[in-house]
């Protein structure tokens, strides 16, 4: 995804209606995410995800509260939220089962991980062989 628009997602606990979490993603680095004046709302500091493969940095912040009337629009009210920020409707919910169906692994990343593991095993074998040959040479 190249240059995604800022978005705010609200996740509610399916068992308890008074637990809610807001995720504010892909906002500009100049946006100031400050603590809420409400003592029941907790906001994390801004986190930066550096995606070097796409030359893109993604900023995100999380807010949560145990209040039943907690709304994402009010959580970041001290921050300068861009006008084009996407707020999903309250009826829409995040379903883990739908995410699992659409999740695909990156084959290039899997190949790189396997290559690194293979090179480590090869390095250990070479180091072990050199150590054994050195000890054998010293013993004779």
From Swiss-Prot:
The keyword Transmembrane helix applies. The chain crosses the membrane at residues 116-138. Residues 19-107 form the Ig-like C1-type domain. GO terms for biological process: adaptive immune response; alpha-beta T cell activation; response to bacterium; T cell receptor signaling pathway. Its main location: membrane. It comes from the Eukaryota. It is linked to Immunodeficiency 7: A primary immunodeficiency disorder manifesting with recurrent respiratory infections, candidiasis, diarrhea, and failure to thrive. Patients show a clear predisposition to herpes viral infections, and features of immune dysregulation, including hypereosinophilia, vitiligo, and alopecia areata. Other features include lymphadenopathy and hepatosplenomegaly. CD3+ T-cells express TCR-gamma/delta, but little or no TCR-alpha/beta. It holds the Pfam family DUF1968. Changing residue 130 to L/F: Impairs TR-CD3 complex assembly. Keywords: Adaptive immunity, Cell membrane, Disulfide bond, Glycoprotein, Immunity, Membrane, Receptor, T cell receptor, Transmembrane, Transmembrane helix. GO terms for cellular component: alpha-beta T cell receptor complex; plasma membrane. Residues 94-115 are annotated as: Connecting peptide. It comes from Homo sapiens (Human). Residues 139-140 are cytoplasmic. Constant region of T cell receptor (TR) alpha chain. Alpha-beta T cell receptors are antigen specific receptors which are essential to the immune response and are present on the cell surface of T lymphocytes. Recognize peptide-major histocompatibility (MH) (pMH) complexes that are displayed by antigen presenting cells (APC), a prerequisite for efficient T cell adaptive immunity against pathogens. It is found in: Cell membrane. The gene is TRAC. This is T cell receptor alpha chain constant. Glycans are attached at residues 32, 66, 77, 113. Alpha-beta TR is a heterodimer composed of an alpha and beta chain; disulfide-linked. The alpha-beta TR is associated with the transmembrane signaling CD3 coreceptor proteins to form the TR-CD3 (TcR or TCR). The assembly of alpha-beta TR heterodimers with CD3 occurs in the endoplasmic reticulum where a single alpha-beta TR heterodimer associates with one CD3D-CD3E heterodimer, one CD3G-CD3E heterodimer and one CD247 homodimer forming a stable octameric structure. CD3D-CD3E and CD3G-CD3E heterodimers preferentially associate with TR alpha and TR beta chains, respectively. InterPro entries: Ig-like_dom_sf, Ig-like_fold, TCR_alpha_C. The keyword Glycoprotein applies. The connecting peptide (CP) domain contributes to the TR-CD3 assembly and signal transduction. The TM domain mediates the interaction with the CD3 subunits. Disulfide bonds join 22-72.
């Amino acid at each position: 995804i190249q240059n995604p628009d800022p978005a705010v997602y609200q996740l509610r606990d399916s068992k308890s209606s008074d637990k809610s979490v807001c995720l504010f993603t892909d906002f500009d680095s100049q946006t100031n995410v400050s603590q809420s004046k409400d003592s029941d709302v907790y906001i994390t500091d801004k986190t930066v995800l550096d995606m070097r493969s796409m030359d893109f940095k993604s900023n995100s912040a999380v807010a949560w509260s145990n209040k039943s009337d907690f709304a994402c629009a009010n959580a970041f009210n001290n921050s300068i939220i861009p006008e084009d920020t996407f707020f999903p409707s309250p009826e829409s919910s995040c379903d883990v089962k739908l995410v699992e169906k659409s999740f695909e692994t990156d084959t290039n990343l899997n190949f790189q991980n396997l290559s690194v593991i293979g090179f480590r095993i090869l390095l250990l074998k070479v180091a072990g062989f050199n150590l054994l040959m050195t000890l054998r040479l010293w013993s004779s």
